Swiss-Prot record:
This is Submaxillary gland androgen-regulated protein 3A. Residues 1-22 form the signal peptide. It comes from Homo sapiens. The lineage of its organism: Eukaryota, Metazoa, Chordata, Craniata, Vertebrata. GO terms for biological process: regulation of sensory perception of pain. Residues 19-134 are annotated as: Disordered. Keywords: Repeat, Secreted, Signal.
Length: 134
């Protein structure tokens, strides 16, 4: 078994230093001559010039003008509609289901007593039993 392990180890080591399938075949030569330089960037205002700065977005200042009131000058906006208008049902807040301090339902009595199951045993002296015939 050691010889099989030794052979497989040598085989794996040899595979590390031999060309794989992706390296087989002759490599083509590099393209003839040097590569062409990239095209120059396109400047619409001529080479060597910096584009003009963008105009400020809100005029001469840095901040936009204040917004005009949506209801005109001096007008008071209408009050919001009532939350429970006609046709709406007002939701009642329900009290907690088990009162305060109960994170779970209150414990109920056990449906059966603890301990081993109870098997009723009728004693032979029980008057409810029929007497055996002699």
């Amino acid at each position: 078994m050691k010889s099989l392990t030794w052979i497989l180890g040598l085989w794996a080591l040899a595979a590390c230093f031999t060309p794989g399938e992706s390296q087989r075949g002759p490599r083509g030569p590099y393209p003839p001559g040097p590569l062409a330089p990239p095209p120059p960037p396109c400047f619409p205002f001529g080479t060597g010039f910096v584009p003009p700065p963008h105009p400020p977005p809100y005029g001469p200042g840095r901040f936009p003008p204040p917004l005009s009131p949506p209801y005109g000058p001096g007008r008071i906006p209408p009050s919001p509609p009532p939350p429970y208008g006609p046709g709406r049902i007002q939701s009642h807040s329900l009290p907690p289901p088990y009162g305060p301090g109960y994170p779970q339902p209150p414990s109920q009595p056990r449906p059966y007593p603890p301990g081993p199951p109870f098997f009723p045993v009728n004693s032979p002296t029980d008057p409810a039993l029929p007497t055996p015939a002699p």
